[in-house]
Amino acid sequence: MSNETNSSNFIKNIIINDLETGKHDSIITRFPPEPNGYLHIGHAKSICLNFGLAKEFNGKANLRFDDTNPLKEDVEYVESIKEDVKWLGFDWNELNFASNYFDEMYKRALILIKKGKAYVCDLTQEEMREYRGTLTEPGKESPHRNRTIEENLDLFERMKNGEFKDGEKTLRAKIDMSSPNINLRDPIIYRISHSTHHNTGDKWCIYPMYAFAHPIEDAIEGITHSICTLEFEDQRPLYDWFVKECEMENIPRQIEFARLNINNTVMSKRKLKQLVDEGIVDGWDDPRVPTISGIRRKGYTAEALRNFCSEIGVSKVNSTVDSQMLDYFLRENLQPKAPLTMGVLRPLKLIITNYPEDKIEMLEIENNAKDESQGKRLVPFSRELYIEQDDFMEEPVKKYFRFFPGNEVRLKGAYFVKCTDVIKDENGNVVEIHGTYDPETKSGSGFTGRKVKSTIHWVDAKSAIPCEFRLFEPLILDDIPENEGKHFLEQINPNSLEILQGFVEPTQIKDAKPFDKFQFVRNGFFSIDNKYTTDEKFVFNRIVPLKSSFKPGK
């Protein structure tokens, strides 16, 4: 699958032109998350794009934390973001914090005030909204808009010195209250917040707004191409205004691309936080949420995620990607290397009545059905086995060829076995089935005397390792979860997690560790959970089923 199609990557074309015309000798990009939550798969697209472009064009990429809001940020998120970037396979040129530039930002704000381009305003947030106007009506000027430069300098310094309460005053850019672009109607540059910052402590009680801080940070770092998502397109004129009016030496270019949306998936950080806070999911790393921590715990590989992000490419048009596309890339990634093993998720005991009670036979079974070079393993086989409950049906429906009374099937890598008896409990539930095997039908023996229509997997009851299986379905029922007509909590799937107690064959997993991946015969690709697996018990997360109707390019 080619990575060069990628919507003909218009950002690459911009970079190529900038390098060929000599506008830049080299490029510097950045990934600038706010450390107020865990990164999700949408951020993975941005990480792959920014770091990938820097690598492709022999440039540099910085990791910068836009930590300008002390009320929402935490060191926990800083560390998780660093881990996510590293896990995806990238490293940064510089590790920066917006808060390290607070002194410089303050100086640039003073430049605006001295040029008559910024003023201290006393309007409340509610009053400011009333003055701002609408998309069809111009705004009204603040009564404080024409304060003198001297008065503004004095008030701004007093804001910095902590003389005013939170929300009592703001510093605003003085642009155009009648602009058709609402972002240019005197946006706030600084607000007062008497809060302890995770990096600067209590040094500051005024903090820059993102729209002001971001272009200043980019210019300070010499970023050549400031790549962001499409919702910032209307803010580009403001971005350019701040770079120009703050007299920045370096002039970065903001470029917007469409964000990643995936069906049945909540991508809003605010909504994800609500799911975590209300205990609907098991933390930020719950395998059902699209955080990078969550999909890593579920068992996704960084390579599959990078391939997915490369294939969807970049565009100027918002769209929703089918989640099965990501699953496709995961299967493609795991199929060649995840060792084949047998696990029974919903066990039903099978007793082979004519097999010797004290006999244990070691059978050779392939490690990868599509790659003989991976060899074979020895799997124990004895009189008592476990099979899947749905591999038996007392009264079979049409075209059901697995176990039913009188029917014969092949046990994978073993023998033909015919169902001879059914054991039920006092409530009529099937708890055990009996059968007989034919010693002449051993796999690999060349037996051709008769054929069966079904092969099923199994585990040996004596040696099988008890374990837990966790199966996941989409957390959100609505195909488009951002549907504004419903509250997203109304779309929660009550059956998004199923926990089963079953068994796995011992050969492949006896020395396994968290995050190891396996292909369970007929059941899917699984990964060992890093949170609930203990020395006493393995917990397996199903990453994806084995098959899907999804085909790339359709």
Curated annotation (Swiss-Prot):
Top-rank EC class of the record's enzyme: ligase
Gene Ontology MF terms in the entry: ATP binding; glutamine-tRNA ligase activity
Gene3D superfamilies: Glutamyl-trna Synthetase, Domain 2, Glutamyl-tRNA Synthetase, Domain 3, HUPs, Ribosomal Protein L25, Chain P
SUPFAM superfamilies tied to this protein: Nucleotidylyl transferase, Ribosomal protein L25-like
Residues binding L-glutamine: 66, 210
UniProt cross-references to PROSITE patterns, sorted A to Z: AA_TRNA_LIGASE_I (PS00178)
Pfam families tied to this protein: tRNA-synt_1c, tRNA-synt_1c_C, tRNA-synt_1c_C2
Enzymatic reactions: tRNA(Gln) + L-glutamine + ATP = L-glutaminyl-tRNA(Gln) + AMP + diphosphate
Motif ('HIGH' region): 33-43
Protein keywords: Aminoacyl-tRNA synthetase, ATP-binding, Cytoplasm, Ligase, Nucleotide-binding, Protein biosynthesis
The enzyme's E.C. designation: 6.1.1.18
Entry's Gene Ontology BP terms: glutaminyl-tRNA aminoacylation; glutamyl-tRNA aminoacylation
Family statement: Belongs to the class-I aminoacyl-tRNA synthetase family.
NCBIfam families: glnS (TIGR00440), PRK14703.1 (NF011291)
Quaternary assembly: Monomer.
Name of this chain's protein: Glutamine--tRNA ligase
Gene name of the encoded protein: glnS
